[in-house]
Amino acid sequence: MKYQVEVIINEDRDKVSRLYVDMNQMPLWEKGLVEIIHEEGTLFKTNSKGLMVFSFDGQKMPMKVSVEKENLPDQIIQIFEVPGAWNRCDSHFIDFNHQTKWVMDVEFKFDEPHDIPLERFIEKTKTSMHIFKDFVEGKLN
C-alpha cells in the first residue's frame, strides 16, 4: 500500500528538519514515546538503526527504526517495523515562501492481509504530521 501526504508548516525548512530529528524534543510531539535506543550508528543518520519505545495504557511497544537515507534539510527516509508490519516514510522538506512544505511518500507492507481502508492510514498519517506541525509552530501545550 502506497500513498502521499503533505502539510505546510509555518516555519523555515532548517528549523523544521532540525526539530524532526531532535531526539530530546521528540517525546513532546511523538505521542507515547518514552525511550529512544541507538543500536547501530547515530540514530537518524544514514544507515543507522535503533528502537523507539512507546508506552500505551501501560504497555511498552518497541518499534524498530532504521534510516535508509538522511540528507537533511532536504530529505530523510525512515523505515519503521513492528511485528507484522513494515512502514517506509520518505519525507521531503521543501522551502515554500518562508514556510516548509513537508511531503511524505508512505509505503506499508503487512505479513497478513488486513481490512483497514487506505483512508484510515492516510488520516492517521496526516494527524501525526499535524501534531508535529503544531509542535514546530509552538501550538502544543
Regions found by a protein language model. Give the residues of each.
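Intrinsic-disorder/low-complexity, polar/charged segments enriched in Ser/Thr/Lys/Arg/Asp/Glu/Gln
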Residues: 2-6, 49-51, 62, 75, ...
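Glycine-rich portal/gate segments that line the openings of hydrophobic small-molecule binding cavities
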Residues: 38-84, 127, 131-140
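Hydrophobic ligand-binding cavity/cleft-lining segments
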Residues: 1-45
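Generic structural detector for well-ordered beta-strands
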Residues: 6-10, 37, 53, 66, ...
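Beta-strand elements of well-folded, non-transmembrane domains
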Residues: 11, 56-58, 69, 95, ...
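Beta-strand/loop substructures that line and gate deep hydrophobic ligand-binding cavities in soluble
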Residues: 79-134
